[in-house]
Structures are given as structure tokens and as C-alpha cells.
Amino acid sequence: MAREYPLDRYRNIGIMAHIDAGKTTTTERILFYTGAIHRMGEVHEGNTTTDWMVQERERGITITSAAISAFWARHDQRYRVNIIDTPGHVDFTIEVERSLRVLDGAITVFDAVNGVEPQSETVWRQADKYKVPRICFINKMDRVGADFEMSVGTIREKLGARAVRMQLPLGAEDKHRGVIDLLKMKALVFQDSEQGSHYEESDIPEEFKEAADAARAELLEAAAEQDDALTEKFLEGVELTEDEVRGAIRKGCLGLKLFPVFCGSAFRHKGVQPLLDAVVDYLPSPLEVPPIHGKTPNGEDAVRETRDDAPFSALAFKIMNDPAFQSQTLTFLRVYSGKLEAGTAVWNSVKGKRERISRLVQMRADKKDEITECYAGDICAVVGLKLAGTGDTLCDDKQPIILERMDFPEPVIDIAIEPKSTADQDKILQSLQRLAMEDPSFRVRTNEETGQTLIAGMGELHLEIIVDRLLREFKVDANIGKPQVAYRETVTTQVEMEGKYIRQTGGRGQYGHIWLRVAPNEPGKGFSFENKVTGGVVSKEFVDAVKAGCAEAMQNGPVAGYPMVDVKVEAFDGSMHDVDSSEIAFKIAGSLAFKDAVRMATPVLLEPIMNCEIVTPDDFMGDVIGDLNGRRGKVQGMTPRPGRVQAIQAQVPLAAMFGYSTDLRSRSQGRATYTMQFSHYAPAPKTALNR
């Protein structure tokens, strides 16, 4: 079967924002206007297409990133748009990270009342990291307090982004009727009676003309700056054509020089079709993003062009267990080069294993369309892969490549979980392992001292969802402990240590001997290991076993048994025996040397520090700041908001934030709100060990 749509008519986009900015509603409207669905769901009714999990519908939030294919007609052509609706809650930031890794462009949705909010800042920085071109949608222009210019100002000031207005709102709050198109210089008025399916173009009303002329002049200047020939025309006073402006803005957007801004109200069915036009006009096709880079198994640089006839390569960016396929694993892939066919075998270059692709599906949230092939530049899901994990590369075994893997943050909070009966013991461990495969920011470990199973995640809501899924999907009966801080440990000085494991039992013995240099690593770098053994005194395979022993020993630190982070290890000397040396002997020797070294390297306990933003009326500001100081918080700054409200930015230890929402409500008569996300780990006070 040949490719249905040429690659230049593909758009792989994400929809991202702060929680409650209207991402899922915007996605729902896009699906309706593209004909992918025939009835619009609403978040408050719990029946949207992309929020298909029970937990999402009950809470009215997006938890997982849902992938959907839709089609849009533009310039007399049909375009295929693969859309991923991502979560806005900070506990599910990892879902955004996974999606951005495989997207070509994004729509960032902002609330017209609040502008840039903490999580919109986080996802914007994540998109910067992956160099994803973006268009902006100022949503909720119908809300009381909606302010388009303020919102654009926050994009420019808080994000340092060059926001270029492509539209102005045609009225705001209850007078919001549509948008002013600054390219065509026309007013687009949306009909309330037809769910916004049609809009009329008309002349710009007199009261908006002056503002529209000024905004258009700014748009033309931004367009002219993207192209020398246009700059010359612009300076000579020659009118730029619509196509010239559109092409120049596209060039600036793809080069991350500027970010086109649109507006509307998704809930009131206004402004969504022009936003879809903008996806086609300003966001890249897979052909317009740089070729994907990776390494060969030998460590040499490798590149894959986005071509159907190139060697096959794809990245597994999401794993989920799907009841519709008898609970088989569903693996989401971004195909970067070549093509994938159902029934063929692929090579997992990270695991070094071959697996067969039994079935391919194209996703429509929780509905699946069976397909036989998936081509370069597309996103699809594979049924039944047993070995692939998030971030693994699937490729052609004759021309293997390992694509850059994803980094996942350390969990900050954990809870103990115990089966209610021995029958549930194995079931609970299997279920937790399957959930950990789906979500790399969720970890499972056993406390060696107590034997308790601990599950760790990015926040209370994250773990609440995990527990809820255990009980409902996997039918596990368990006792759940109270949330606790996920402390970590590290070393603060450098130590050299010898590790020996020698056993003689009459037959073949065991001999492992290694010297390690253990030192602090850069914050956030995790565990790193370097082989500096020279002269062949210890072979590479035995040094690899030493590395495995060290990595295993990292799971239980010397201070209080918490996992260790940010430790750098160098193997620099040792010896081996011609007969008795084995990988297991060197693994044990490495583990012994590491444990002795970290005990001597002045180990410390680390606690998670959170970035908090508290939005409070002026009247309660003194009380709120005093309370933060009492929680060992450090105020970083304050930003005035409209209506005698202040946004306080602070860094506070997570240990001091349990129960904070209840305290804040009582201090502010229920009028203050806060958001919190992980910042970094820092040394904990000695009193933390006594808790």
C-alpha cells in the first residue's frame, strides 16, 4: 500500500499549556471541525475524546498524552494532522516531555485572564529544549477579566519570546464575537447557533480599526525582518503581499525567531478554524525539521533522513497496557525513516533483541484503526512488543542506530504499599512493574531494612492515580501508607577504595579485584561510570560487571538507605585471575568497593526543594509570607496581578508542604491558590533523619 498523503502535508503537533487553560476543549473542537468526531464532548461532562481514562473523566484533567489523527483542508489540499493532547498538571510533566521529543510543532494554549502561568512556563522551556516551533492561542477571550494584550505581554516578558500578533480579538468577555485577521484585515464573526461551524468575513468595525492598523504594521515589520528582499521592499514603502507575509512568518516560526499569536474561545466555538489554518501555514512538516541524529552500536555518529527509502528507525516514546487488546502492551512509535510493516521483525538496538510487529494501529484517543504500514514522519502504535521500553530505538538490524534517549526526573514523593493477602503479593509486583513500564517517572523499590514495597512519583496526585489504577484496572487489594518525602543521598568528597572478592572452595574459585575512585557528580547528572583501567589488567567485560555492581549498590545509600544520586565513579586499577575471574566476582568486588567508598566520602541526605507560586490577595500577603518562612521557604520574588492580587514565587522543601493547601485556604479565607513543581535536591537538615 502506497503512502496516502505526501510528507509535506503531514503535521505532527502537540497541544500544551498550564492546567485549566483549555487544551482538551481546544483539541475537542479541532476534532469536531476536522470531522474526526461528530459530537463535541466537554471536560466538565467527562466525555471528551482525548481524556478517555476513567481517572481523567472523573477529575476533569488530562493525565496521559493521547494521540489522534485528523485531516484538514487548506489551499485546496488535504493535510494529515497527528495531534497529541498533553497534561497541564505539574505531576504529569513527564508526559509532556515524552511528547515533545517526537513532535515537529506545537500549539501553546494560554488563559486570557492569567496569561503565562507556572506550568505554561515549564512546558515552554521543555519545548525550547527540543527546539519545537510553536504558535500561541490566547484562549477564553469570553471570560470575565480576559485581557489579550496583557497575555501577549506576559509571553514576551516571562518567556522572553518574540510574540507576533496574527489576530486581535473582536471584543472581549461577553462581547467577544470573533477575531480580526491582521493578514487579510477582515473581521471573522462566528455564529453561535451553528456551534461555530461557520463564520462570516466582514469589514473591521470602526472602533477596532486604529488598533488593527497598529498591530498590522508590527506584523509587517516582523515579516520583513525574516527576509532581506522583503526588508528592502518594506523600507521602500512597497506593500507586501499576503503570501509574502505568510511565507516570512512561517520562516521565522520554523527558525524559532518568532511565535505567531492567535486568539478565541474554544468553549464558545470561536477562533478554532483559523488556528487549524495556522497549523498548516506556520508549523513544519516532517521534511522541514532537521534529520534525526544517533549513534551506531560502535559509538560512531549516525544520521537518518526523513525518507521512506532510508533504513528504518523509530523511537518508542510511550508504553501503555490496553484492555482492548487483552491487556497486551501498546507501544507508541514516531517513525523517523523508512517504513514499518505489520508482520515484520524489528531490531531493538538498546536491548540488543529482535521483536516481531504483530499489528499496527492508528490512534483516535481510545479508538484504534488497524493499518498495514507506517511511513517516515508518521506516528502509530504497535501491539504486543514485550521488550521495548520508553526511549528505546527500533530499527533495521542490518543498519542499526541508537537514537538519543530521554531523561526522566527523579521522583520526589513515595508511599508504602502492602498487599492485603499473600495471594495479592505476586499480583501487586507484576502490576507495579507494568505501570512502571508505562510511566518512567514512577519507580518501585523495596526498603531493605523493613522489606516494604515503596512506590515513588512526582507528586501526591501522580501517586493517587497510580493507586487508583492498581485497584480498578489490575484488581489488586492493598493497604496504602501516607505519602512521604522521597529523600536521596549523595557523597561530598572524593575517595579511592579497593574491592576484593576472592573465594577458594576446592574447584574453580572466584576472583575479582578492582580499585575505584568515587566522587560527587554535577547536580542532576545522576550516576556516571568511567573505565580508566589501562594495560589490560582488567578486561572490559569485567569492568562492565563492576559498573553493574556499583549501580545496584546505588539503590541503598549509607545514611538512611535511600537511593543515591549524582555520584561519579572511575575504575582505575585492579587485577584478574586467568581461571577464577568471572563477571559475578567482579560485580561483587565493585559493589563492596563502592559501599566502602561512599561510607568514607562524607555522605549526606538530600531533600527535594520545590518551586512554589502562591497567588493571594494583598490583604493576606504578610500572613502567607510569614507562613512560608516558617516552612523553611525562601521567597524569590513577587509579581503584582490585576485586582490587588500578588503572585509570590518561593522555594520550599517538600517536607514542609504536606497539608499546605488546607492551611493556605484557612489563612486566606479560601481566596489564595498555589502551584508547586520540583526544582532540585539540596542537603537536608539533621532533624530530617529523626522524622
UniProtKB/Swiss-Prot annotation:
Domain tr-type G, residue spans: 8-287
CDD domains per the UniProt record, alphabetical: EF-G, EFG_III, EFG_mtEFG1_IV, EFG_mtEFG_C, EFG_mtEFG_II
Cellular compartments annotated: Cytoplasm
Gene Ontology annotations for the cellular component aspect, listed alphabetically: cytoplasm
Primary location group: cytoplasm
GO biological process, one term: ribosome disassembly
Binding-site residues, GTP: 17-24, 85-89, 139-142
Transmembrane segments: none
Highest taxon in the source lineage: Bacteria
Family named by the database record: Belongs to the TRAFAC class translation factor GTPase superfamily. Classic translation factor GTPase family. EF-G/EF-2 subfamily.
Function in brief: Catalyzes the GTP-dependent ribosomal translocation step during translation elongation. During this step, the ribosome changes from the pre-translocational (PRE) to the post-translocational (POST) state as the newly formed A-site-bound peptidyl-tRNA and P-site-bound deacylated tRNA move to the P and E sites, respectively. Catalyzes the coordinated movement of the two tRNA molecules, the mRNA and conformational changes in the ribosome.
PANTHER family (alphabetical): RIBOSOME-RELEASING FACTOR 2, MITOCHONDRIAL (PTHR43261:SF1), TRANSLATION ELONGATION FACTOR G-RELATED (PTHR43261)
Record protein name field: Elongation factor G 2
